[in-house]
Structures are given as C-alpha cells and as structure tokens.
C-alpha cells in the first residue's frame, strides 16, 4: 500500500516522531507496537493500519492538497489561470487567520465550484467571507495546518505519546508554505522529505526481503543519509495558538 510504503521511508528515526504522508490526501499519525482498540479511538475516527517491520500505523485520514488542486481547476474554468506558485504567493500576501474551514466537511468533498463552497461554509459558520483568490487559498492552507494539530492532539490523547518532530513525506514536501504552517501550527520542528517516499519505502522492504539490509530501521538510516530533506522550525507560535483556539471551537460546533 502506498501509505505504508511511504511511512517505511521515514527519514526521521526519533522515538517521538509523527508522520504526515501528504499529497492529494493527508494521513497523519505515528507508529505503535500494537493496535489502539479503544472506544475513544473509534469516536475520534482514528484507524489502525498494518505497517512495516511489524508496526501499526495509527493515523487519521484528512483531506489534503486536493483542495488546492480543485480550487486551481475551478479558477481555470473561469478564465483565471494560475500556477501553484502564483497561488502560494497570493496566499502569502493575504490577511492571516481571516477564516477557517474543516477540510473534511461534507460540503467540500465533491468536485466543482470549491471557492464558492468555501465562501458558503464561512458564511454558514458566521465567519468573515474570503473574497480574493489569495484569501481563499490561505484559508485552505491554514485550515489544513490547524487540522493537523487537531489530529495529532487526538492521537496524543489516545496513546499518551508526546510528539517532538513531524516528518512530512511525499509530494506535499515540495509545498514549503504548507510545511512552514505545519511547524508553526503544531509548534514542533518539521522535517520534509523524502519526496518519493512511497517508492523508497517499497525499495527498503524489497531489500529487507532479499537480505541486503537487516531491518526497516537500517533502510531509514540510509534514506536519512542519502535523501535531501528540509527542516522547518516553528515561528509566530503565539499567533497560531490563538488561531487554533478559534479553530477548535469551530470544529466542536460543527460536530454537534
């Protein structure tokens, strides 16, 4: 499975590391020695998936960069053609923390007219309505970063683990803006890479099966030595703490 292979290719081997396999979807979690089979875990919609090396990948599935991709596609249909770099630059220039969405809200899950759906979500929840393209894209980025924090808090509550670093894997590692925001929101360092985590994880597992390496951990150390990664340190964490308080209240209202 692509997610399990990606996690096998983690470039961070710290015991307190969490992972985020990030692309069209976001799968955030940690490795455990055994499944977490509790009512609380079920209520928080956390899943246990068999991983590499006899471990369990305990995670939450969240929407991901599909939201940016779909927004870009809808804008292009309206004659507004932007590169991903254009969208990032406009988002960087937009007002921070103007409004938020739950990336997993049912009304945002279908194709078509996503910018207007985001506006309607903000109107429905009594928030400021994003008007410009930059405000809409920034809303998506900030909401993803805050949802990552929310999910890791849930995982911490269920496992008792405190996380000291987040390893982002896959195509999302190329999105520096999202990596920055994840570090700021969660208030832990983010290590982005490897990009081709799924392929590398697959290679590691095959090398182990062939006896070329002794363990997945040995393969991860090879990846850490040979693959390019980038580290992001938390910044402006007080601002993000304030935004998270508002965001958490929004999610709690939506869940009722």
Pin down the residues of each PLM region.
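Active-site core segments that coordinate phosphate-bearing ligands/cofactors
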Residues: 1-165, 174-198, 204-235, 239, ...
């Amino acid at each position: 499975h692509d997610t399990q292979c990606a996690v096998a290719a983690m470039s961070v081997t710290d015991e307190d590391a969490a992972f985020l396999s990030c692309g069209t979807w976001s799968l955030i979690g940690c490795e455990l020695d055994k499944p977490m089979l509790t009512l609380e875990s079920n209520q928080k919609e956390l899943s246990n998936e068999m991983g590499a090396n006899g471990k369990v990948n305990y995670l939450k599935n969240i929407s991901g960069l599909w939201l940016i991709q779909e927004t870009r596609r809808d804008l292009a249909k309206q004659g507004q053609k932007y590169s991903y770099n254009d969208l990032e630059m406009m988002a960087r220039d937009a007002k921070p923390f103007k409004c938020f969405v739950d990336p997993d809200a049912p009304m945002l899950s279908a194709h078509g007219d996503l910018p207007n759906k985001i506006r309607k979500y903000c109107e429905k929840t009594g928030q400021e309505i994003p008007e410009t393209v930059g405000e809409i894209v920034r809303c998506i980025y900030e909401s993803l970063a805050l949802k990552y924090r929310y999910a890791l808090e849930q995982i911490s509550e269920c496992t008792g683990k405190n996380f000291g670093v987040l390893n982002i894997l896959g195509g999302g590692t190329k999105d520096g803006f999202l990596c920055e925001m994840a570090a700021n929101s969660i208030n832990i360092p983010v290590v982005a890479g490897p990009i081709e985590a799924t392929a590398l994880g697959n290679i590691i597992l095959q090398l182990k099966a062939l006896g070329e390496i002794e363990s997945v951990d040995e393969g991860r150390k090879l990846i850490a030595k040979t693959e390019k990664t980038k580290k992001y340190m938390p910044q402006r964490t007080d601002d993000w703490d304030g935004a998270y308080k508002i965001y958490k209240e929004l999610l709690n209202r939506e869940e009722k």
